[in-house]
Amino acid sequence: GLGDVYKRQGYEGLSFTCGDIAGYEGVDQVDMVVTLHACDTATDYALAKAVGWGAKVILSVPCCQHELNGQMENELMGPVFQYGLIKERMAALYTDAIRAQVLEHMGYRTQILEFIDMEHTPKNILIRAVKQGSPRNNINELRKIVGFLQVRPMLVQLLAPEAYTFRDCLL
């Protein structure tokens, strides 16, 4: 099984657990968190856990970014958002850009990279975040993007709720 593989490679301290990341409480601190195709907001919960655990490195390959697709509204973007496929793809890109901004707000140097050629899978975005220590003061940028799109992304709710103005809380 998988346990034998990682033991043969010298990773005896590595463990695997099957379950819902949102409720996982098995560790207090980690060096690195890797997520691969955690669907929709599962990526957000995994990123929030990674930040909470003080992960020095986060490597995340998001998948199925449906959350914003159902929330995005903007009169100026209406002519674009009327096309479901375009709106879906833009929602995925906005989701990952917002995730990167939140991680920077939490003190990570963040990059969004293509990690595999498009011919293999369209889900080829890697969010790479390395802990820098000092948070980036980008709350106004976060406020602008969530306000522009009229969205409440899960990762913002979990790690940067101050990005919402008082008026937003009344919605």
Located regions from the model:
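Short, small-residue-biased leader/transition segments that mark boundaries at the very start
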Residues: 2-6
